[in-house]
A protein has these predicted regions:
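An anionic, turn-rich surface loop/hairpin at beta-sheet edges
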Residues: 83-108
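N-terminal glycine/threonine-rich, aromatic-flanked beta-hairpin/loop signature
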Residues: 45-88
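Generic short beta-strand segments
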Residues: 34-39, 57, 84-90, 120
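Sec-dependent signal peptide recognition
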Residues: 5-11
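Bacterial signal peptide processing site
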Residues: 21-23
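Short, exposed beta-strand-loop hairpins at the edges of beta-sheets
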Residues: 106-125
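C-terminal motif of bacterial Sec signal peptides marking the signal peptidase cleavage site
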Residues: 16-19
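Tryptophan-anchored aromatic micro-motifs
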Residues: 28-44
């Protein structure tokens, strides 16, 4: 009988621990990324202040502290990231290195601390925040 109680307690503990939270589906991409530099295809460079991409599950949030916050859908396939911002205006996306409400980025570099995205419009360099 004592063994049965221990078995039930062990099963309950395993269920409780495994039920906590959602696991990241995007690997190192999940989290908040601060934009360190934007290099436009025209050759111009920009260093935005307090601008971030936040990625979780299939959602992307673009935020510039005290200025704007834009939310959309994203799909990550390992070597590319496709962002769709259906309710955003293009002028609200420009400070984030996007020139349209649908943007495909090539993932040129991704570690747990650094991210480099490349589109036909701009190259973005991030650090994990």
């Amino acid at each position: 009988m004592d063994t049965m109680k221990r078995y039930i307690i062990a099963v309950l503990l395993i269920l409780i621990v495994s039920a906590c939270g959602k696991t990241p589906i995007n690997g190192d991409l999940d989290g908040r990324w601060q934009i360190m530099k934007i290099e436009y295809a025209s050759g111009e460079e920009e260093t935005p202040e307090r601008a971030y991409y936040s990625v979780a599950l299939h959602t992307i949030n673009l935020m510039q502290v005290g200025v704007t916050s834009q939310t959309g859908n994203m799909e990550y396939t390992g070597d590319s990231l496709f962002a769709e911002m259906p309710v955003s205006k293009i002028e609200d996306l420009l400070p984030f290195g996007m020139n349209g409400t649908e943007q495909r980025f090539g993932v040129k570099g991704l570690t747990s601390k650094h991210l480099i995205l490349q589109s036909d419009f701009a190259r973005l360099e991030f650090r994990k925040f």
